[in-house]
Amino acid sequence: MSVSGTDVEMVVPAITVRDLCFSWPKGDRVLHNCSLKVPKGEFWMLLGTNGSGKSTLLRLLAELLSPQSGEIDIQGRLGFVFQNPDHQLVMPTVGADVAFGLVEEKLSIAQVRERVEEALAAVNLLDLQRRPIYALSGGQKQRIAIAGAIARHCEVLLLDEPTALLDPDSQLDLVAQVQRLIKNRGLTALWVTHRLDELNYCDGAFLLEKGEVVDRGDPVRLKQRLMQIQEA
């Protein structure tokens, strides 16, 4: 299927996917010749109906799954944020959880403390450093997961429907904060969503149908297209 819409030439992509194919062991095809590019320093969203392959694509990018064919190129250290943050918050307190991701770097205690405080300040949760994880709201848990990626100096963020379990106010607070983080810190992000109001915060979007990118570009245009489909 050919891709419609304006395909802007991206000189420096941070995420490149070329002709990616993936099927489950039983033979169900999920992605077929899927290709996309996310420019460095931009915030893009990935849209599509349930079963279109959005979450599978993110897991392939994060090397949680392996494709049958195709190429993936990611420029920079990668951070992944799950739909349910309880899947990745493993330590009892906020500060300890952010620090846990730094173990492999063999930093000094002072360096770890500096990284943790910098990351929590970036998501406006520095005052919760000693707070138990169980005492956090859903939105705060997602921000802690993002802080973990910032502490590890990740340059590319993959976020799999991070607002799916949040109320509308917390949803928009989170997407607005991620937008600011990306711009202020020069990050690149690909955010899976099915909520059209989140498109107001991104630089561009991809529409995935049956495992293929069928449209890409201006989020306002894509939002209008999807609203027309829903109203039909």
Model regions: which residues?
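Helix-to-loop junction immediately C-terminal to a conserved catalytic motif
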Residues: 62
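Conserved ABC ATPase "signature" region
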Residues: 110-128
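A short, flexible loop at the N-terminus of ABC-type nucleotide-binding domains that lies
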Residues: 2-17, 21-33, 109
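The feature captures the beta-strand-to-loop junction immediately N-terminal to the Walker
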Residues: 47-49
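Catalytic Walker B motif of ABC-type/P-loop ATPase nucleotide-binding domains
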Residues: 157-161
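Conserved ABC ATPase signature
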Residues: 132-136, 140
